[in-house]
Amino acid sequence: MHFRNFNYSFSSLIACVANSDIFSESETRAKFESLFRTYDKDITFQYFKSFKRVRINFSNPFSAANARLQLHKTEFLGKEMKLYFAQTLHIGSSHLAPPNPDKQFLISPPASPPVGWKQVEDATPVINYDLLYAISKLGPGEKYELHAATDTTPSVVVHVCESDQEKEEEEEMERMKRPKPKIIQTRRPEYTPIHLS
């Protein structure tokens, strides 16, 4: 992100106004402006209706500070009005800055990894050697009890299935024993051309 520098403009105040009549009625607006004209004659107002804010620009910072001291958190038409010094935002460039390249290498890897990057080693797989030992002792159709049953737990028994290769060989033998199906040709329908009839 680009560097932002907030500076306060001590010759401008922002008034947070709860009463929306200021933005639509000229009499209310004149009353509001008269509050601040007592502190400075060369004053300008900018009304921001959607934000319910008014920017008040004074000719010097002393009159702005005096107005804030006297009018901050005072009531205007029955509602509290708050005054703050306006902030001006100075950005180093008028263009948007690119985002920080924190973890972008994961999205599209560069030619070389960033400094300090270490490859994470995959954890070794969990191998149950008891199960492998039991399977190695068994033949097809036999079973092996890994854990005997107790009052609270069931027993764990391994059944070894027949291999797929043996099944495939049996199916192939059955196919060879079956007679080949006879394909009966479909007879062609009778056709007489229209121009001959």
Curated annotation (Swiss-Prot):
It holds the Pfam family Calcipressin. Residues 163-197 are annotated as: Disordered. CDD domains: RRM_RCAN1 (cd12708). The modification Phosphoserine is found at residues 108, 112, 163. One of its GO terms (cellular component) is nucleus. GO terms for molecular function: calcium-dependent protein serine/threonine phosphatase regulator activity; nucleic acid binding. GO terms for biological process: calcium-mediated signaling; negative regulation of calcineurin-NFAT signaling cascade. Phosphorylation increases its ability to inhibit calcineurin and decreases protein half-life. Keywords: Phosphoprotein. Residues 163-173 have a biased composition (Acidic residues). Belongs to the RCAN family. PANTHER family: CALCIPRESSIN, CALCIPRESSIN-1. Interacts with RAF1, PPP3R1 and PPP3CA. Inhibits calcineurin-dependent transcriptional responses by binding to the catalytic domain of calcineurin A. Could play a role during central nervous system development. This is Calcipressin-1. The gene is RCAN1.
